[in-house]
Regions:
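Paired acidic/hydrophobic, glycine-rich loop segments that form the ligand-binding mouth/hinge
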Residues: 6-13, 74, 120-124, 140-142, ...
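An extracytoplasmic/periplasmic, membrane-proximal ligand-sensing/linker region
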Residues: 94, 134, 179-243
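Non-transmembrane alpha-helical segments in soluble domains
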Residues: 1, 60-63, 111, 115, ...
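Short, flexible active-site-adjacent loop segments at beta-strand->alpha-helix junctions, enriched
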Residues: 14-17, 54, 79-81, 144-147
């Protein structure tokens, strides 16, 4: 972000940026102030998956079971303050359930323990869990986006049962602040043209759960501010601290 604003340095942004803006109190930059938004790229849903040993097959059953068995459900994540974690904490807050958070150093070890039954539930990136869902090794209860996924059309959304719930991970492009508006507009058009390629769309669908999300610079700027505010509320309410 300290690079010259000449259009030759682009930043690949993701959900961690809007989470870390609140999670880390002493960053040496201001994410919103120091970025010139260019365009959204893609979003992907998380899927709420449980080990098949959990005696529930639907989200309402899981909520009822969790409320009736306090302290019994362990929720894995890729680490304290990870997208997996805050997505789960948002669910806990909105569904009114208590789950024990078990942070791991990354998604792979968390998924390994979920598959073995050491933990019971995880909000995982759909591309990561999809092979295990198709193999019957994990049971999907819901996806976290506002609409169902083409990759998992039979799986409902969390919002179907917890009104107002929506969460997703995302990718987008930015540039150093003060990059000329004409350059930002040109980059926006070129990026949106590239991701409209049918081959790129097909490849993203093959990964499972990814949806292209092109936008104007103004739309992406508004999204970044909204997403930062959303996760700030969750982090402060749940008192999440970085590891």
């Amino acid at each position: 972000m300290r690079s010259p604003p000449d259009g030759y340095t682009l930043l690949l942004l993701n959900s961690s940026n809007t989470i870390n803006a609140t999670l880390y109190e002493r960053l040496n930059f201001d994410f919103i102030r120091d970025i010139a938004p260019i365009s959204g790229l893609a979003t992907f849903s998380f899927v709420m998956v449980v080990n098949p040993s959990v005696p529930t097959t639907t989200l309402p059953e899981f909520i009822a079971y969790t409320k009736g068995n306090p302290g019994k459900i362990n929720m894995a994540s890729a680490g304290s303050g990870s997208t997996h974690h805050v997505t789960g904490e948002l669910f806990k807050m909105m569904a009114g359930v208590e789950m024990v958070h078990v942070p791991y150093r990354g998604s792979p070890p968390a998924l390994t323990d979920l598959l073995s039954g050491q933990v019971q539930v995880m909000f995982d990136a759909t591309p990561s869990s999809l092979p295990h869902i198709r193999a019957g090794k994990l049971r999907p209860l819901a996806v976290t986006t506002a609409t169902r996924l083409e990759a998992l059309p039979e799986v409902p959304t969390v919002g179907d049962f917890v009104p107002g719930y929506e969460a997703s991970s995302w990718l987008g492009f930015g540039a150093p602040k003060n990059t000329p508006a004409a350059l930002i507009d040109r980059l926006n058009k070129e990026i949106n043209l590239a991701i409209s390629d049918p081959a790129i769309k097909a490849r993203l669908m093959d990964l499972g759960g990814l949806v292209l999300s092109p936008s104007s610079p103004a739309e992406f700027e508004k999204f970044l501010a909204s997403d930062t505010e959303k996760w700030a509320r969750v982090i402060r309410t749940a008192n999440i601290k970085p590891e």
